From Swiss-Prot:
This is S-adenosylmethionine synthase. It is an enzyme of class 2 (transferase). Its EC number is 2.5.1.6. It comes from Chloroflexus aurantiacus (strain ATCC 29366 / DSM 635 / J-10-fl). The gene is metK. Belongs to the AdoMet synthase family.
């Protein structure tokens, strides 16, 4: 795709986003709200919490090990659902009356022994104290950044997220009180030689009260959502707009579809523009490299683009469970780099430390900061301060690359 994308005079790419009331996103937020509660009591808690939901029911399951404090899980679940907006049976789900089942047990000691004491520590090969912490699992993680938007994200996913955030704002502030929590957006961007030039298609599906006409919903969402979030220069007479194309979206949330933590990993990351290692984020403490290393790779990628080393970059890092040092690190700049890729890779290795313990330290990840990432995307956020979105290694990278 990269060569076609960069060399084609006309190329289309589509990304989607979903609202906080989407059943899968509900589950992500519940899992991360529970994670935050455990980290508030014990910053070194080991947490792997999954959530499932269907009509009238939420199930929380997983593995947790922590030192102290009572965690009122059912209360956290109901509060999270209420904050999302499911406060009445009219919406198909009610935070106060839904069933909540909890099935949580301790982390496997076989896993814990590899995280508590890395292989480097066991064989006496530690370079420093950071190598006492092993990766919580094997796997590969990716990070990406590009210069298409101010937040250094692909235009299609950035716009899809903006539409959803605006949709949630007008629902909650009373501008469009008939809207309900479940919604999805989708944006197709037209590119010319790797640069976004216009929006070809906008799709929004939003749950709504039963007495609102399709014509009113369409007019309101175009005026209060689409026109406020998509640059005017990118909309033209040929832009196609679809609003609730089925004609009706009254039944939504868990009543319309079951939900599960970790089923929106492309929404959470780069909208399909970059590759994905397959591991979900929500409900996992930072010892799980599925989450922490993906955050670190985004941090590295964003600093590379901000430093002017490349206009577009993707990184891959890989780990073995119980081993501190990454197994591999690669950089791909798709022909957009100011210096050779091997120079960028060398600079990254000089400036960034991608061992799990160092990632946790440098990004200060043992804090209750995760619930707010669980809807609206984990990357490119301009509404919240996330450590992996900071471009605080730009000058170091430029020096290391000889610029």
């Amino acid at each position: 795709m990269a060569n076609t994308f960069m060399n084609s005079p006309r190329f289309y790419f589509t990304s989607e986003s979903v609202s906080e009331g989407h059943p899968d996103k509900m589950c992500d937020q519940i899992s991360d709200a529970i994670l935050d509660a455990f980290l508030s009591h014990d910053p070194k808690a080991r947490v792997a919490v999954e959530t499932a939901t269907t009509t009238g029911l939420i199930v929380v399951l997983g593995e947790v090990t922590y030192e102290r404090g009572y965690i009122p899980i059912e209360e956290i679940v109901r509060r999270t659902v209420k904050e999302i907006g499911y406060t009445s049976a009219e919406y198909g789900f009610d935070a106060d009356t839904c069933g909540v089942m909890v099935a949580i047990h301790g982390q496997s000691p076989d896993i814990a022994m590899g995280v508590d004491k890395a292989l480097e520590a066991k064989i006496g090969a530690m370079a420093d104290d950071v190598e006492a912490v092993g990766a919580g699992d094997q796997g590969m993680m990716f990070g990406f950044a590009c210069d298409e938007t101010p937040e250094l994200m692909p235009a299609s996913i950035a716009l899809a997220h903006r539409l959803i955030r605006r949709l949630e704002r007008v629902r909650k502030d009373g501008t469009l009180p008939y809207l309900r929590p479940d919604a999805k957006s989708q944006v197709t961007v037209e590119y010319s030689f790797g640069k976004p030039v216009r929006v070809d298609t906008v799709l929004i599906s939003s749950q709504h009260a039963p007495d609102i006409t399709q014509d009113q919903i369409r007019a309101d969402l175009i005026e209060h959502v689409i026109k406020t979030e998509i640059p005017e220069a990118w909309l033209d007479s040929q832009t196609k707009i679809f609003i609730n194309p089925t004609g009706r979206f009254v039944i939504g949330g868990p009543m319309g579809d079951s939900g599960l933590t970790g089923r929106k990993i492309i929404v959470d990351t780069y909208g399909g523009v970059a590759r994905h290692g397959g591991g979900a984020f929500s409900g996992k403490d930072p010892s799980k490299v599925d989450r922490s290393a993906a955050y670190a790779c985004r941090w590295v990628a964003k600093n590379i683009v901000a430093a002017g080393l490349a206009r577009r970059v993707e990184l891959q890092v890989s780990y073995a469970i119980g081993v501190a040092r990454p197994l591999s690190l690669s950089v791909e700049t798709f022909g957009t780099a100011a210096v050779p890729d091997e120079v960028i890779l060398k600079a990254v290795n000089e400036v960034f430390d991608l061992r799990p313990g160092a990632i946790i330290r440098d990004l200060d990840l043992r804090r209750p900061i995760y619930r707010k990432t669980a809807a609206g995307g984990h990357f490119g956020r301009t509404d919240i301060d996330l450590p992996w979105e900071r471009t605080n290694r730009v000058e170091e990278l430029r020096r290391a690359a000889g610029l």
